[in-house]
C-alpha cells in the first residue's frame, strides 16, 4: 500500500508543479479559471501555512521537550503582536520592536514555567484547564485594552508593494509572457518560515544543544 500511496502523492505533486510553472495550454483556463487566480490561491495557502508553522513550531518544541500543554501559546503570540504594534508606533521602528517583544514574551514564558507548569508537572489535564483559563484572561484583557478593531504594522519600504516571481501567470496574444506579482511582505514571511524551519532542524540535529533537547524528549 505504501508504494502506491507514495506514487499517488508524487504524481499529484508533479501535476501541481506543472500547473504552477508551465504555461497553460488553450482551453485549460476555461476549466480551472484564470491561472493568475489559481496561483494567488496556491501562494496564499503556502503563506498561511508558513504563518501557522511559525506559531506551531514553538508549541510543538515546548510540548515535545517539557511535556507542557500550554494552550495559552496563541494568546502569548497575540500579546506579542499588540506589543510589537505599540513599540513600533512609539519608536517608529518595526525592526526595534522584534528584540524588545522577544524579550518581554520570553520573560512571561519563564514566569509561566516557574509559577504554573513547574507546580503541575506531568498533570496534563490540570495544565490544559489552567492554560485555557490563562488564555481567556489574557484575551479579555487585550480586548479591554486594545478593543476589537484591527491594528496594522506597516511594512518597510523595501517590503511594500508587489514583487515579481518568475512564475508565468499568463501569455498575452502578442506572445508576451506575464509573470506573477505577489506581495513582497508575504514572500518574506515564507522565507522567514523556511529559514526558521531549517534553523530548527540544524539546531536539533547538528549541535550539542540539540542533542540535549532530543535526549530530553526521549527521556
What are these regions (language model features)?
Residues 1-66, 71-216:
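Small-residue-rich transmembrane alpha-helical segments that form helix-helix packing/gating elements
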Amino acid at each position: 500500500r505504501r508504494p502506491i500511496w507514495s506514487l499517488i502523492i508524487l504524481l499529484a505533486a508533479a501535476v501541481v508543479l506543472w500547473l504552477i510553472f508551465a504555461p497553460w495550454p488553450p482551453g485549460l483556463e476555461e476549466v480551472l479559471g484564470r491561472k493568475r487566480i489559481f496561483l494567488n490561491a496556491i501562494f496564499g495557502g503556502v503563506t498561511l501555512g508558513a504563518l501557522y508553522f511559525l506559531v506551531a513550531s514553538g508549541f510543538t518544541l515546548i510540548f515535545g521537550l517539557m511535556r507542557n500543554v500550554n494552550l495559552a501559546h496563541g494568546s502569548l503570540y497575540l500579546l506579542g503582536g499588540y506589543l510589537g504594534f505599540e513599540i513600533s508606533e512609539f519608536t517608529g521602528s518595526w525592526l526595534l520592536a522584534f528584540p524588545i517583544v522577544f524579550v518581554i514574551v520570553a520573560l512571561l514564558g519563564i514566569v509561566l514555567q516557574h509559577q504554573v507548569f513547574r507546580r503541575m508537572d506531568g498533570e496534563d489535564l490540570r495544565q490544559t484547564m489552567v492554560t485555557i483559563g490563562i488564555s481567556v484572561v489574557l484575551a479579555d484583557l487585550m480586548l479591554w485594552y486594545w478593543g476589537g478593531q484591527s491594528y496594522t504594522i506597516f511594512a518597510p519600504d523595501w517590503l511594500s508593494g508587489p514583487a515579481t516571481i518568475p512564475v508565468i501567470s499568463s501569455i498575452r496574444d502578442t506572445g508576451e509572457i506575464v509573470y506573477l506579482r505577489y506581495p513582497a511582505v508575504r514572500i518574506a514571511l515564507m522565507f522567514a518560515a523556511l529559514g526558521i524551519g531549517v534553523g530548527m532542524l540544524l539546531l536539533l540535529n547538528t549541535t550539542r544543544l540539540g542533542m540535549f533537547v532530543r535526549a530530553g524528549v526521549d527521556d
